[in-house]
């Protein structure tokens, strides 16, 4: 499946938020848009531009391209409840995102690689689809030959327990995680406003 391969740091500077952990230190040093006129860009932002920016934030944070993102929106509309919250929950339940949240990888891009390269299982079955929707009660663990990966061990060791969300139970010693429940919107601390995205698609 196609995915973004450009500089996430440049995109973060353009949108004004850190879209990945590695972009945080660069954004702190250069908190303005890239390019020759990045520091001088001022002026009132239109409503459409604000809505578009929020959509871009969500797409880049979760590593989703336009067609797939639009499909998530359509599914969110068809579900009961608040459309924006449904959209966030669908994105948070992606397999690669849950792997990232569990601390198995320091980034969603790295988590996507772990999934795509068949290192992980769900309920004992090999799953290599990053967009797979993880369900409450699902157990995620590593295949036997993948359990001694230094990169994963290092990521787990560097991930404080306080960073692991309450809806995921992680057994670091056995490199295993249990997806306890779908998170509520209030539990998601990401720098986007999904309601503006809903307004954009509702036009």
Swiss-Prot record:
The keyword Ribonucleoprotein applies. Pfam families: Ribosomal_S4, S4. This is Small ribosomal subunit protein uS4. The gene is rpsD. Residues 93-154 form the S4 RNA-binding domain. HAMAP family: Ribosomal_uS4_B (MF_01306_B). Belongs to the universal ribosomal protein uS4 family. The keyword Heme does not apply. PROSITE patterns: S4. Gene3D superfamilies: Ribosomal Protein S4 Delta 41, Chain A, domain 1, RNA-binding S4 domain. Part of the 30S ribosomal subunit. Contacts protein S5. The interaction surface between S4 and S5 is involved in control of translational fidelity. One of the primary rRNA binding proteins, it binds directly to 16S rRNA where it nucleates assembly of the body of the 30S subunit. GO terms for cellular component: small ribosomal subunit. Keywords: Ribonucleoprotein, Ribosomal protein, RNA-binding, rRNA-binding. One of its GO terms (biological process) is translation. One of its GO terms (molecular function) is structural constituent of ribosome.
